[in-house]
């Protein structure tokens, strides 16, 4: 377990993984996100710097830290996958400041792919499955309303289940 807000834990993770042989890790799943909505979702322009930076560090920059920690043990043809959202190009009010942070996560995927291409063939991808009922989404104010609305808009007229994403 690694708390990405604590640099000593990230350093310990890096040291632990650096002891592994190269090609030990064939794939990494980054599924880390957090946003402080203790005061509820506020209009975007009222976002507090402290909350924005904390959410960016945990939800986006942690992918860079994780990739660096695993770099020496990651297979040359390995894969790094993160979980994004499907609404980085729309403005879902209930998602608050997390939409631009998830957009930065997707940008990090592209830049990590380019950066790692200098020395490997590691693939970086983001899975943007759409609204899912998860323990994390339960903490997003108004999420259920958007989840039920999105369910009506899908071609199959039913929500995507977390098991469907996990089994792909």
Question: Whereabouts are the PLM-identified features?
Answer:
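Rossmann-fold cofactor-recognition segment
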Residues: 1-8
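A conserved hydrophobic alpha-helix of the Rossmann-fold in NAD(P)-dependent oxidoreductases
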Residues: 9-14, 137
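A glycine-rich helix->loop->beta "capping" turn
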Residues: 12-31, 35-40, 123
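Catalytic loop of short-chain dehydrogenase/reductase
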Residues: 33-72, 76-119, 128-134, 152
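Acidic donor-diphosphate engagement hotspot in glycosyltransferases and nucleotidyltransferases
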Residues: 136-137, 164
């Amino acid at each position: 377990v690694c708390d990405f807000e604590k640099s000593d834990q990230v350093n310990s993770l890096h040291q632990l993984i650096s002891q592994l042989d190269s090609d030990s890790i064939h794939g990494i799943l980054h599924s880390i996100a957090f946003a402080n909505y203790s005061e509820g979702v506020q209009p975007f322009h009222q976002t507090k710097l402290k909350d924005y930076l904390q959410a960016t560090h945990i939800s986006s920059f942690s992918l860079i830290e994780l990739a660096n920690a695993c770099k020496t043990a990651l297979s040359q043809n390995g894969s790094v996958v993160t979980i994004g959202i499907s609404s980085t190009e729309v403005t879902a009010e209930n998602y608050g400041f997390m939409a631009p942070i998830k957009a930065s996560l997707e940008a990090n995927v592209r830049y990590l792919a380019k950066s790692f291409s200098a020395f490997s063939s590691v693939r970086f991808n983001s899975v943007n499955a759409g609204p899912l009922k998860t323990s994390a989404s339960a903490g997003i104010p108004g999420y259920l309303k958007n989840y039920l609305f999105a369910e009506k808009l899908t071609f199959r007229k039913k929500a995507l289940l977390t098991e469907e994403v996990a089994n792909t």
